[in-house]
Amino acid sequence: MAFPGFGGNTQQLVIDASSSNLKVAVGTYNAKTGNVYLEKVGIVPLESDTISDGAITDQFGVVMALKHALAKLDITQKSTIVTVEGAFMHTRDLELPAVKPEQLKDMVKYEILGQSTNRDMIVEYIITGKTLDEETKGEKYKVRATAVPVDVATDYKELLKGADLQPYAMDVNPNAVRKLFSSGMINGSVNVSNSTLLLIELSSNTTTITVLDKGFPVLTRRMQFGHKNLRQVAENVKKTQGGGDKQSSLARRLNITKSDAETAIPVEEIDVWHESLADEPSLQSAANSYFKNLTDSVSRTAQFTINKYHIDSISSCFLYGSGAGYKKIDKELSRQLGTQVEVLHTMSTVQGPKNFIISEFVNCCGALIREN
């Protein structure tokens, strides 16, 4: 999905602007092999609420942070893809008559915007399959459509221009995830094409659960809770104990570009295994609250999807996002859910620089994939 108003090149800078930190990567997509190649990656911490639920609230602050980070990372690529996600997005699955492209486009817009009070929206769609009408036996398209307000797209376009970048395309994270996980092997052992999986993005303020059935996301749910409070409580505990005064190996590997962030407690030093929290009641309480929200959301989403879409039972869960770095989070979540849980470490379709941590750059990788 590429929204109009943006325009083209081969190697791209891609920015994931959906969370409290910007994720940036430079790379290419080879359509023949289906592989993504990343040359440089980095994370740009932002001041609190500079981007709120995917919407820019402090354009100047983001521009300054982005320009500083790109200079420090020695990224000179100008052609830029940005991928976003927020409550402003509206996505629907539709079944529409198999008509000509222009007619289908009008039908999709009517279905998406017909009941909306905001008609100033950009609407894009993909055809995900075909079916037959039960009554007429006529052919119908299965369509997934997404609408984003024009002013959101305009804000990001102006942001890129303010950072001396050239807008190329705009994507949305669910679409980026769809493209990235359409095929390939996860962690060297799970074939996406013949598995039913849960992908769980653990962000600071949100949690996104995607049910992936044989390479297609049948359902995506984004919840308004994240690991921010758990991180803050852990930092307070560590600082009380006199820790947190040196840059972590993870911060170096991720190329975090802000000196303030380099002194923060890295998540890989925060152990969330239940036995490790016995002597830290405040951290234990924060972890219990977070895992309760997480397990309840995962269980409800999985059960709803199995009942509604009649898919196979879910075989594995894979964690990505900033929260996937917590020590033993996969082990603890597996214990509570009673199913296999792994952190996303590798994908056969993605190659990155040395010590590349794919779990932080999933949306960037998917957004690099351009479909014509």
Model-identified regions with their sequence ranges:
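Gly/Thr-rich phosphate-binding beta-strand-loop-beta motif of the actin/hexokinase/Hsp70
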Residues: A2-V44, T80-E85, I186-M223, H227-N229, ...
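N-terminal phosphate-binding loop and adjacent alpha-helix
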Residues: K40-A71, D279, L283-A286, Y290, ...
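Phosphate-interacting basic helix/loop segments used at nucleotide- and nucleic-acid interfaces
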Residues: V63-L73, G184-S195, R300-A302
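Active-site neighborhood for divalent-cation/phosphate handling
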Residues: S79, T83-M185, S348-V350
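Glycine-rich beta-strand-to-loop/alpha-helix junction loops that act as flexible
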Residues: V82-G86, C317-A324, L344
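Glycine-rich phosphate-binding/hydrolytic loop that grips phosphoryl groups
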Residues: A176-K179, G184, A324, E342-N372
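Adenine-nucleotide phosphate-binding core of ATP-dependent small-molecule kinases
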Residues: N236-Q241, D245, S249-I314
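Glycine-rich phosphate-binding loops at beta-strand->alpha-helix junctions
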Residues: S313-T339
